[in-house]
Amino acid sequence: MSERAADDVRGEPRRAAGGAAAARQQQQQPQPLQPQRQHPPLRRPRAEDGGTGDTTTSAAAMATVGERRPLPSPEAMLGQSWNLWVEASKLPGKDGTELDESFKEFGKNREVMGLCREDMPIFGLCPAHDDFYLVVCNDCNQVVKPQAFQSHYERRHSSSSKPALAVPHTSVFSLLPSLSKSKGSGAGGSSRPPSGGVLCASSSSKLLRLPKEKLPLRGNMKPMHPVQQIKVPHGRVMTPSVKVEKMHPKMDGTLLKSTVGPACPATMSSAVKPGLNCPSIPKPTLPSPGQILNGKGLPAMPTLEKKSEDSSNNRKFLNKRLSEREFDPDIHCGVIDLDTKKPCTRSLTCKTHSLTQRRAVQGRRKRFDVLLAEHKNKAREKELIRHDSQQVPHPLRDPHPTPPRTPQEPQLPAESKPFLASKPKPQTPSLPRPPGCPAQQGGSTPIDPPPGQESPHPPLPATEPASRLSSEEGEGDDREESVEKLDCHYSGRHPQPASFCTFGSRQIGRGYYVFDSRWNRLRCALNLMVEKHLNAQLWKKIPPVPCTTSPVSARVPHRTNSVPTSQGGISYLAATTVSAPPVLLSSTCISPNSKSVPAHGTTLNAQPAGSGAMDPVCSVQSRQVSASSSPPSTPSGLSSVPSSPLSRKPQKWKPSKSIRPKESSALSTNCHNASSSTSGGSGKKRKNSSPLLVPSSSSSSSSSSSSSHSVNSFRKNCVAHSGTPYLSTAPSSHSIGLNCVTNKTHSVSLRHEQAGRGPAGVSSAEPIKRMSVMVNSSDSTLSLGPFIHQASELPVNPHSHTPLDKLIGKKRKCSPGSSTVGNSGSKPTKVAKLPAMNNVHMKHTGNISGAQGLTNNSLLHQPKARP
């Protein structure tokens, strides 16, 4: 032991024969615990490696095989096969067999140890460049990393005495299992203590010498002089001592304290988080020398310790052999294994058994698909939590310190500025995201990974277009099972070129480059056409809200034969508006001598006027309103617009019960009794795509058919009004309905009513019938309740608070005082009280104009029901 250690400290090259003899001599001596320093084959020795600084380990290793010569330059064999270069690079005078034999007889005593590929999770991808330290197991002389030591012992020597190693409280990080299932490499390997021959480990805040009574060894362990090695009986349990830090050249051995026990280096803490194999952890090793001198400057110690303990518990469970797990049908595959006759205890995402086999397993508390979805969601959540937690200790383990992020100009997605001369956007020198991260693909905007998740890769090229991101769908399924992930840095993305020629093109989309700007207009026009087409398809079902403030005559295709007169009706609408746009609920037929007959419905003006304040032109409009609004107290609980006599402000609309009178076809002949506005409608109800129109039927046959609609079909299209109906009050009598009584158009329209119906002396009950025609002929989706004004000479509705369930579907006779004034012989209307549909107004209880209410009402409730 002393010969090997002395040789290593002095750095003298050892020849193969002498090494073999020394190895045989060492086999007879008890093997003490020694830290193994991995010597890369082609690395030059450094002064801080200890000794005199003239150690030529790589030269010694190659000298045992043959004289070393420089490899031939690949440029000398330009265009030829790589095999020629391999042959030319072989050592002179030796063929492959001799090389193999010499290496075999050189055995375990060579200075540079060959590692097999299975050990890559332990030793990393590039042992030539990675600095790490090894420990030797006293039982089997296996060389393992400190992180892998505990799992190695549990796997190999758990039958023998368990390690009586208590983690000292002064050291922060306990020894954690490496998650590699692979074996360690060959047992040999050179071991040398650090300069001064002392073993060091860093503790939480300062380097502490452990008290002698706390040394966790069962054998009588004598603390030796610091310069000497601590001797341990061979039969004792492994006591790995770990050389933690690369020694700074100026540091003396006297600064180092010694400790025994499985105190892992604090710098390796983050490496063992969910295990060495977590892909986002680059390597479990030491940072640059200046970062942790004297063991200080280690941030976030307690949290790291907690995380490492949790991860060790989790990984112990995962590393359990499948046969040792207790079967749970809710979390395990459960398919009976033919060999062991036991249920499979892999997770629900078991790749060994098919989906049908896993679905056929009995005893699960839920269906297999539900459990599988929950399992995948949990795995994703764990992954997210793990990546969040790894953002904290990013100063540790960062072998290539990244340059500070350059201030980046604000980047817009390429879709928002498609035709600007956009070169490939410079991406900040950020690092690729670890493979566990969800792929963030934001069009062609480059992504910066979170600043904490720094990985050991060199920065990405600055001119890399971010449109080449790769997505990682489907990786979350077997993350939990992939225990054998490599402990080496690798990128989750395809390698990117540092720069590439764009050949004068401009990138205007994801992977979309344009060479000629002459086609920009055509491309833009095509894009707009495609967008318009898609939007038109979308808005066929959801009509857009018009934001105009004047009645749009071009968007009101009238459905009667009296187009000129109805255009006159629109001009009267424009005359009556003061502040709010009237909304055409249906086409209105107006006779040439200002006799208004609401043939298909009514035109509601959203602006209530003061009593007697309207001129005869406005009275035409107000007559039309009064056709539907003068009966205030029908049993359907119509609510009115409360307005003072002189107020011109838009009033507060409240939803209430809508009227749905069931009229006979005799009542619906009001549509046709005007002399100049006989409607020649088709009698069919067709869907109207104009958002301003509520489709109405134009003949008495369709109105009677729609009046035969069941209340249930109405219910389907309505939203029940949750509030209490708004009480119609007496001050609301000064609304437009009053004007229609005082103006001449009322009597004129009464004349037409007598001509069409026969009973004389029809008073304001006539507008009820007109109103019922309108409601019946519309598709039972429009609630006119909030927009119906009440006349002054009519009493307050006595039925406004009748409960909804009593009135739905019940036919009630109107009281003479409530529905007919001056015409008690008129035919009583059968009214079924129905819920109002404009539930949208429950949100707009403020002072909003009636036009908005009407617009919302007509928009949200386009008719779709068929008789």
UniProtKB/Swiss-Prot annotation:
Keywords in alphabetical order: Acetylation, Cytoplasm, Cytoskeleton, Isopeptide bond, Nucleus, Transcription, Transcription regulation, Ubl conjugation
Sequence ranges of Basic and acidic residues compositional bias: 1-15, 379-400
Ranges in coiled-coil conformation: none
InterPro entries (UniProt xref): Ataxin-7-like_regulator, SCA7_dom
Biased composition (Low complexity): 16-39, 619-647, 689-711
Species this chain originates from: Mus musculus (Mouse)
Transmembrane segments: none
Residue ranges constituting the SCA7 domain according to the UniProt record: 320-387
Described function: Acts as a component of the SAGA (aka STAGA) transcription coactivator-HAT complex. Mediates the interaction of SAGA complex with the CRX and is involved in CRX-dependent gene activation. Probably involved in tethering the deubiquitination module within the SAGA complex. Necessary for microtubule cytoskeleton stabilization. Involved in neurodegeneration.
GO cellular component, one term: nuclear matrix
Entry comment describing in which tissues the protein is expressed: Widely expressed in adult tissues, with the highest expression in heart, brain, liver and kidney.
Location of the region described as Disordered in the Swiss-Prot/TrEMBL record: 1-59, 379-483, 600-711, 845-867
Subunit structure: Component of the SAGA transcription coactivator-HAT complex, at least composed of SUPT3H, GCN5L2, TAF5L, TAF6L, SUPT7L, TADA3L, TAD1L, TAF10, TAF12, TRRAP, TAF9 and ATXN7. The STAGA core complex is associated with a subcomplex required for histone deubiquitination composed of ATXN7L3, ENY2 and USP22. Interacts with SORBS1, PSMC1 and CRX. Interacts with TRRAP, GCN5L2 and TAF10. Interacts with alpha tubulin.
Biased composition (Basic residues): 649-659
Gene behind this protein: Atxn7
Keyword Cytoplasm: yes
Protein name, UniProt field: Ataxin-7
Linked residues for Glycyl lysine isopeptide (Lys-Gly) (interchain with G-Cter in SUMO): K243
Site (Cleavage): D252, G253, D330, I331
Residue location of crosslink Glycyl lysine isopeptide (Lys-Gly) (interchain with G-Cter in SUMO2): K243
PROSITE patterns in the record: SCA7 (PS51505)
Acidic residues composition-biased segments: 472-481
Modified-residue entries (N6-acetyllysine), positions: K222
UniProt keyword annotation of Transcription present: yes
